[in-house]
């Protein structure tokens, strides 16, 4: 283990108790602590509306293994048309959420327009690439006019600060250090999250990763990793309930699903 990795682990663990002090007792309806009465393995029994969490056939997250994907160039380049929009930042106790109040743009899948509605943060990452879990996952939740849902996930490893989170730090601090659970974040630009040119990506059918674990969600997981600083991840952890400091749902079985993979088109001066 490198000295840099040891430092990052020390930084996070040394401030763990400050995370606990910000617990919100009214947000303990479910927990991410495995083995607890309201932990992930019991979500499906906590509420009749959450039964899919326990008996669903297309649950997320999953391990995305390159040796099990179907290479599908016909998926085409990721088509997005995002734009800056007014938003709030909300702490629901389980995660931090950017909630757009005006049109933040869209993603297009199979000629269907999915409008960006909100953005969630999970640490560590929920999805795993070839058995490796990363330090943060950002999930961009979209909805079509006929109420179909699609989520685009970007995974991050420790490194340089993420510019999108940098712009939100003051607002994260506000909802972490006060009784407020939602603040006006002004204008937020989601284009900062997807600054990759023609990224390779995985596509599969899954579910939301928190109760009620609704299925029939089209997932797009970007293969290229972003970077985030340990301090930024720590800010997210400090803001949430003590039961959600590590708010990543355990991996779910793939079962009979197919994972499709769009391989980025290489150029003479570029590579995946």
Swiss-Prot record:
pH dependence: Full hemagglutinating activity after 3 hours of incubation at pH 3-9 at room temperature.
GO molecular function: disaccharide binding; hydro-lyase activity; maltose binding; protein homodimerization activity; zinc ion binding
Post-translational modifications reported in the UniProt record: Not glycosylated.
GO term, biological process aspect, one: one-carbon metabolic process
Function, as annotated: Maltose-binding lectin. No affinity is detected toward glucose. Has hemagglutinating activity against rabbit erythrocytes at 3.9 ug/ml. No carbonate dehydratase or trypsin inhibitor activity detected by measuring the hydrolysis of 4-nitrophenyl acetate or the inhibition of bovine trypsin-catalyzed hydrolysis of N-benzoyl-L-arginine ethyl ester, respectively.
Family as reported in the entry's similarity comment: Belongs to the alpha-class carbonic anhydrase family.
PANTHER family the record matches: CARBONIC ANHYDRASE, OS08G0470200 PROTEIN
Protein's recorded name: Dioscorin DB3L
């Amino acid at each position: 283990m490198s000295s840099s990795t040891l430092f990052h682990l020390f930084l996070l663990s040394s401030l763990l108790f400050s995370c606990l002090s910000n617990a919100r007792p009214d947000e303990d309806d479910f927990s991410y602590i495995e083995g607890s009465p309201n932990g992930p393995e019991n979500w499906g029994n906590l509420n009749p509306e959450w039964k899919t969490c326990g008996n669903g056939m297309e649950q997320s997250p999953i391990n995305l293994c390159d040796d099990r994907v179907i290479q599908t160039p016909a998926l085409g380049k990721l088509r997005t048309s995002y734009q800056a929009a007014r938003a709030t930042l909300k702490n629901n106790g389980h995660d931090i959420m950017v909630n757009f109040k005006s049109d933040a743009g869209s993603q297009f899948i199979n000629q269907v327009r999915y409008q960006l509605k909100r953005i969630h943060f999970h640490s560590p990452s929920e999805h795993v690439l070839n058995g490796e879990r990363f330090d943060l996952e950002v999930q961009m939740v979209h909805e079509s006019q006929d109420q179909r849902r699609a989520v685009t996930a970007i995974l991050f490893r420790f490194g340089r600060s993420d510019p999108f989170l940098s712009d939100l730090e003051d607002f994260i601090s506000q909802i972490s250090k006060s009784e407020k659970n939602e603040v006006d974040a002004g204008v937020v630009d989601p284009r900062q999250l997807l600054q990759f040119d023609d990224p390779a990506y995985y596509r599969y059918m899954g579910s939301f990763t928190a109760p009620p674990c609704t299925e029939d969600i089209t997932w797009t997981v970007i293969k290229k990793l972003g970077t985030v600083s340990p301090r930024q991840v720590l800010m997210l952890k400090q803001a949430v309930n003590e039961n959600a400091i590590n708010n990543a749902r355990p991996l779910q079985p793939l079962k009979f699903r197919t994972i499709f993979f769009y391989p980025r088109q290489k150029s003479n001066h570029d590579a995946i």
